[in-house]
Amino acid sequence: YRVGGSPQKETDDYSVWTNDLLNKIIASKTIIQPGKATIGHQLINSDVVYVVVNGRGTMEVIEYMNSKEGHGSDPSRGIDHKDSYALTAGDVILVESGDYVKVVNESDHDQLAYLRIFDREGWRK
């Protein structure tokens, strides 16, 4: 199966392609433009494996004391632990269900691309 075709989500900052043909897992590809970032979101009902394919950037991960559904750029409720990881091609990162994730492309010239692999139960269309 290939993650390609038309983007499922597209903004000026980033694009997301998703392959939902498999029965138990979802594979998606995200490309972030130079100097841009994802909006950030909280993972619901699924751990997610991120595989950095190209570029460099940072990943902000916040663990909550009380998880709630949500998207947004200011996850200020009930923060238990906050980490920031430098990303480069070849990195593999596991983010657990309930955590908030935001990815920033730190390059002025190159795109940042990564794959996400997660359980179908955690997919928000």
Where are these regions (language model features)?
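Short acidic-glycine-tyrosine-enriched beta hairpin
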Residues: 49, 63-98
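Short beta-strand His + acidic residue motifs that chelate non-heme Fe in jelly-roll/DSBH
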Residues: 39-41, 59-61, 83-85, 95, ...
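Conserved short histidine dyad/triad with adjacent acidic residue
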Residues: 11-13, 26-45, 62-66, 97
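His/acidic/aromatic-lined binding-pocket segments of jelly-roll/cupin-type domains
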Residues: 29-30, 40-42, 47-52, 84-85, ...
